[in-house]
């Protein structure tokens, strides 16, 4: 059974809404286990087949919690090579954070990233939450087809 982590940080609740919808979509595909969380230790990352990171953009950057997690994983030599990576997030002005996450996943950890990231300006409406569910489903289906 494939394991997916949907990890997010959310100050306003917008990225959290996206994360929950993505996790819901991922769970709708059989033979996958989905963990939705706002915090994990770096050592835990290696146990997942896919890691989806929700990083809202604040002041043209990703949240410090996400930076710290990736830095710890790198320092501790956590191998994520070949795992599926994806990023999503809400933003008010610029939306860089999910792009930065994908760059780190691809260039530092050699993950197989799904591009482009899923970006939502401000609060996701019902249509956008449907897109989020489809995004999660797409990740789950990619794991099943690759298994």
Where are each of the predicted segments found?
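Short amphipathic alpha-helix with an adjacent loop that forms part of the alpha/beta core around
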Residues: 42-45
